[in-house]
Amino acid sequence: MSKKKVLHLAKWYPNKVEPLFGIFIQKHIQSVQESCDHKVISIYQTNTIISNIHRKVNYLNNTEEVVFYHKKGLLNKIRVLYRVWKETKRFKPHLIHAHVMGWTSSLAFLFSRTNQVPFIISEHWSGYRKKGYAQLNFASKILRKISARKAEQICVVSNFLKEDMIKCGVEANYSNIGNVEDGKTLDIGKNKTFSFVFAGDLVQETKNVKGILEAFYEVIKHHKNIKLDIIGDGKDLKNYKDLSDQLELNNHVSFHGNQSNEYVFKTLSQSHVLIVNSHFETFSIICAEALSCGIPVISTKCGGPESYLNDETGILIDRDNNNQLTKAMMTMISDYDKYEPEKLKSMVHQFSMDSIGEKINQQYLRALN
């Protein structure tokens, strides 16, 4: 019997401009690639192309990935959506999987209505907690709510995200499916200097790296031989560098900029503790990656992380609380030996390719039956 065909409409997806953009969506698709025939279509706006619309095809482990690059402008957006519609019709899917609500869920809903094809939605967007949802226009909100009600299932990465969506009036059949953590490990030694690490977007309103620098400043008064590695880029990078300079931390703090997944894993493996000081996270894959590298985590109670972090994996603190963060960092230095690397690694088996793939496959079977 031939395999069922699943079409993935991805609002975020790795591309030539941003190779790590929505990589967690790509990993979700990879986790189920053996069960069905898959095709991915995503759209990316950029002015780096010569023509108004450019179609680029890539094959990853027998999955066809199509990225439509288009220049800014309403007419170009309409044209590219029309091409996505035609490509969808040619593929003749048995099921559509929309990743991150927006044009993806709207097109999935319309195709479902006209071609009697079921669809499900996976949501990762943190905008339901922030101002993002409130700033959507009336039509966008209505389309999201209709698509959500008509979808066979909405898969969210945490109960925290589900609760935020319900508060915004997005009613649906919900299920919780976390992100994939590959379980990569590197057999390399730790830094000789006790090392804290942060990896993520350098945006103050979400990640609060300012609080990390201020807490680190307090800790270094008591422990001189420590360091802090900051991986990532964003609009507040200069502000953070200026603050590091102002606090005279430059001999202890290193800014690494945007780096590859491999670089992040290597740095995590060499470090002692990951710090997540976010105001909100729908899941926080970096926490799971740290555990897979055998290092404990200091994290704020910011939504997603506390669904799988506990006293055995590190220390949970209140949001926007520098005193608690300072104390947690001091405790990690003094009590570090209590965290067993192999036990930390075992905590992320629930997010393995096989485990997440099985959960997604169950949703496919329900939708198709």
Region spans (language model):
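Short hydrophobic beta-strand element within catalytic cores of glycosyltransferases
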Residues: 296-299
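Membrane-proximal helix-turn-helix segments that form the acceptor-binding/catalytic region
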Residues: 27-30, 114, 137-154
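Aromatic "clamp/platform" in nucleotide-sugar-dependent glycosyltransferases that forms part
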Residues: 279
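Donor nucleotide-sugar binding/catalytic pocket of nucleotide-sugar-dependent glycosyltransferases
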Residues: 24, 42, 144-186
